[in-house]
Amino acid sequence: MIETESTGLLTLYSDVRAAAVHWLWYPFIASGKITLLQGDPGDGKSTMMMRLIAELSTGGATPNGCPLGRPQRIIYQCSEDGVADTIKPRLEQCGADCRNVAFINEEVYGGLTLDDERIRQAMMEFRPKLVVIDPIQAYL
C-alpha cells in the first residue's frame, strides 16, 4: 500500500463515502443527474421523451413498466418545433397532463443558453422532476 495524505487539491477515494443512485427510470435516467439521449435524426428521441414526459406528468409508468408514482412536473424546452402546432399536440396525443409540463417562452423572453439564469429561476419556481433540453446543441 502506498502511504499518502489528502492535500487541498486532491481527495483520496478512500475518504469518500459511497452513496446509492436514485433513479427516475432505472437504469436509464438517474434523478438529479445530467443524462444525454443521443441518436441519429429520425430515431425517435423526441418521441420517446414525449412519452416519458406524458407518463411522468400523470403518474404513469416508465416505458419498461416501472411505476412513476404521483404526477410530477416537467420543463420541456425545445427549439426545433412550434409550441402550439407541434409540441402541445404531441404531448396531448401521448396523454400528458399539460398542467404539469412547462417551458420558458423564448418568443416572449428571448433566446436561452444553458448558462442562462432564467433556467435556474424556472427550476426553482416550478420544481420539476425532469428538465428536457431538446436539442442541447441549440442552447450551447
Predicted region positions:
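Alpha-helical interaction segments
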Residues: 13-15
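Hydrophobic positions on the alpha1 helix immediately C-terminal to the Walker A/P-loop
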Residues: 48, 52
